């Protein structure tokens, strides 16, 4: 019986080598196993050491047209895309049991996208003492950097990470080198690479950075010549621990730029990279006492320090200037009662376009109806056409008085223009726009008691800067900061947009706008435009369930998490969401303290 199996095994082996058919080889091995398991083991060693295996593999590759390029391998109609893991910047031990249970399915959901997927994990140990020595040296170098520049938040964050790694080693967790491949199977190159891209983005959402493998990396994997370079701890490998982390926005957006604060769950530093987003605007919504003004102040000051661009605060309650003094920051004080906006003077823009802008400013400031607004536009047009170089509000008042219109309408227009005249002196040598410095500027609106005139000042400054910086580039040149933004946003409608148009244009005007208000109703009828186009959207603590139900339209939240966590956010804690990415983050905001820079 044994001889029969040996004869069969030899015949099958010969057929397999001649025809390059793997089925015959497998059957031969099975036949040998029935004869004697030791024979099979000896044959396996012989097969691997001999040239037979090399000849077989070589001919199999030739016979089946294997193609290896960056990102994929093709064998006839079977295509495999290769993703390689670059970084796993987290630790699951920072999560609570409940958070871990909630997030456990995310990793598997990402893998389910690909249908059939293989994971290759290679691991090797490292010299712990040498690794520790390198960490101590790096920590020492970073401390020198921080001593020279105490405002360097990125260096502080890196030092914190190194100290955390040293602590892990001291607790007995051994680091190791690793390499991880995700292999996606498909029937075409296009489908394989497209699926790999979707998986890559899904992995990024749980904090895992990956990329398509290069051709030589795929070849090294197949030839078992891979060199392991990345170093991690056991608690950083989610695939072996069967868990996932919370979804996070694009890695490049939250790891560089303006320091916003620490993530509440894992205390990781969160940044806002204004240069990487398509829209440099921010809107913070929260009730009185939630900490939105402090955060807005911090955001504006940090933007000026980090990017070196002018920041203009509109100070409605005089609390901005008081807080800046309290924290020891120098700023330029600008009083619109002393520095004129010069609304009747314009440059860098066509006359007809500016007249439309001026009509929009006055219409939105005084909430004029269509008839009165159209009549005012006609009067402005005739006044400037009659007296282009010397037009004044007095001239326009005379024009209105001579106009053959309804007396009530005439009185209404005279009241509006007289109010504008009282504020807009039109003296060029004290021009408000020219008074704006390159640093921090505070426009004091607290001395203006009329909401209409406050809006006039803010709208006038916005339009003047839009015309000044209306150059086709993506560079951020100025940021306007508006606390109590409801004063502007409620007055806009779909036909006469100023702030909404600025926000929709993204970086187009070169102007960023940071705003804070108390609730969704403050945004007026254009609320969807503001919420859908804002680059950084923040929601602060609010016990109203209706409020959080509205938030769920713009952020990817589940009901349980909302009820258990968000309603009980403390002062200075906030849920943030970046544009075009519904994945939210809960942070403890970083605010100014005296000499914080």
Swiss-Prot record:
Q: Binding residues for ATP, per the UniProt record?
A: 286-293
- Topology in membrane: Single-pass membrane protein
Induction / repression: Up-regulated upon UV stress.
- InterPro entries reported in the protein's UniProt record: AAA+_ATPase, Ced-DNA_import, P-loop_NTPase, T4SS_component
Can you name a GO cellular component term?
A: plasma membrane
What start and end residues bound the annotated signal peptide? none
- Extract one GO molecular function annotation from the record: ATP binding
**Which compartment or compartments is the protein found in?**
Cell membrane
Q: What is its main location?
A: membrane
Known Gene3D superfamilies for this protein?
P-loop containing nucleotide triphosphate hydrolases
Name the source's superkingdom. Answer: Archaea
Gene inactivation phenotype reads:
DNA transfer is completely abolished in deletion mutants. Deletion does not reduce cellular aggregation induced by UV stress.
What are the transmembrane regions? 10-30
Q: Which UniProt keywords apply?
A: ATP-binding, Cell membrane, Membrane, Nucleotide-binding, Transmembrane, Transmembrane helix, Transport
Q: What biological function has been recorded for the protein in this entry?
A: Part of the Ced system, which is involved in DNA import.
Its protein name is DNA import protein CedB
What organism is listed for this UniProt entry?
Answer: Sulfolobus acidocaldarius (strain ATCC 33909 / DSM 639 / JCM 8929 / NBRC 15157 / NCIMB 11770)
Report which gene this protein is encoded by: cedB
């Amino acid at each position: 019986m044994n001889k029969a199996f040996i004869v069969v095994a030899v015949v099958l082996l010969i057929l397999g080598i001649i025809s390059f058919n793997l089925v015959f080889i497998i059957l031969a091995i099975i036949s040998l196993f029935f004869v004697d398991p030791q024979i099979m083991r000896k044959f396996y060693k012989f097969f691997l050491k001999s040239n037979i295996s090399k000849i077989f593999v070589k001919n199999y590759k030739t016979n089946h047209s294997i193609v290896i390029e960056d990102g994929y391998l093709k064998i006839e109609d079977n295509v495999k895309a290769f993703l390689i893991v670059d970084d796993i910047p987290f630790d699951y031990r920072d999560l609570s049991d409940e958070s871990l249970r909630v997030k456990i399915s995310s990793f598997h959901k990402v893998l389910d996208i690909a249908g059939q997927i293989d994971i290759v994990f290679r691991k090797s140990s490292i010299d712990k003492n040498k690794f520790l020595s390198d960490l101590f040296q790096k920590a020492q170098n970073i401390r020198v950097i921080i001593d020279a520049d105490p405002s360097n938040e990125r260096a502080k964050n890196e030092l914190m990470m190194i100290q955390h790694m040293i602590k892990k080693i001291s607790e007995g967790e051994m680091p190791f080198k690793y390499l991880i491949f995700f292999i996606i199977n498909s029937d075409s190159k296009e489908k394989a690479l497209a699926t790999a891209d979707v998986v890559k983005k899904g992995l990024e959402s749980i904090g895992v950075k990956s990329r398509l493998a290069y051709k030589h990396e795929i070849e090294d994997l197949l030839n078992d010549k891979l060199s392991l370079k990345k170093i991690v701890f056991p608690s950083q490998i989610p695939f072996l621990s069967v868990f996932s982390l919370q979804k996070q926005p694009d890695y490049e957006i939250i790891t560089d730029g303006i320091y916003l604060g620490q993530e509440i769950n894992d205390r990781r530093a969160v940044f806002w990279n204004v240069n990487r987003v398509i829209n440099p605007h921010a809107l913070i919504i929260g009730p009185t006492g939630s900490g939105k003004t402090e955060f807005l102040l911090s955001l504006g000051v940090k933007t000026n320090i980090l990017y070196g661009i002018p920041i203009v605060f509109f100070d409605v309650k005089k609390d901005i200037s008081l807080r800046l003094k309290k924290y020891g920051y120098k700023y330029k004080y600008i009083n619109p009662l002393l520095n004129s906006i010069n609304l009747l003077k314009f440059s860098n823009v066509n006359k007809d376009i500016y007249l439309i802008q001026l009509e929009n400013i006055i219409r939105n400031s005084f909430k004029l109806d269509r008839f009165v607004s159209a009549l005012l536009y006609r009067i402005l047009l005739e006044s400037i056409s009659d007296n282009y170089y010397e037009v004044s509000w007095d001239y326009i008042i005379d024009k209105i008085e001579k106009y053959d219109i309804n007396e009530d309408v005439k009185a209404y227009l005279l009241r509006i223009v007289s109010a504008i005249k009282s504020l807009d002196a039109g003296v060029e040598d004290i021009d408000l726009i020219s008074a704006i410095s390159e640093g921090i500027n505070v426009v004091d609106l607290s001395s203006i008691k009329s909401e209409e005139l406050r809006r006039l000042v803010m709208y006038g400054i916005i339009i003047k800067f839009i015309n000044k910086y209306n150059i086709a580039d993506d560079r951020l040149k100025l940021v306007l900061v508006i606390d109590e933004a409801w004063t502007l946003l409620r007055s806009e409608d779909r036909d006469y947009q100023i702030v909404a148009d600025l926000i929709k244009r993204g970086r187009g005007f070169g102007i960023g706008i940071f705003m804070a208000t108390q609730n969704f109703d403050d945004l007026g009828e254009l609320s969807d435009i503001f919420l859908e186009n804002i680059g950084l959207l923040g929601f602060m603590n609010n016990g109203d369930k209706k409020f959080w139900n509205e938030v769920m339209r713009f952020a990817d939240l589940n009901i349980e998490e909302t009820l258990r966590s968000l309603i009980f956010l403390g002062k200075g804690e906030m849920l943030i969401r970046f544009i075009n990415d519904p994945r939210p983050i809960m942070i403890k905001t970083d605010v100014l303290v005296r000499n914080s820079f």
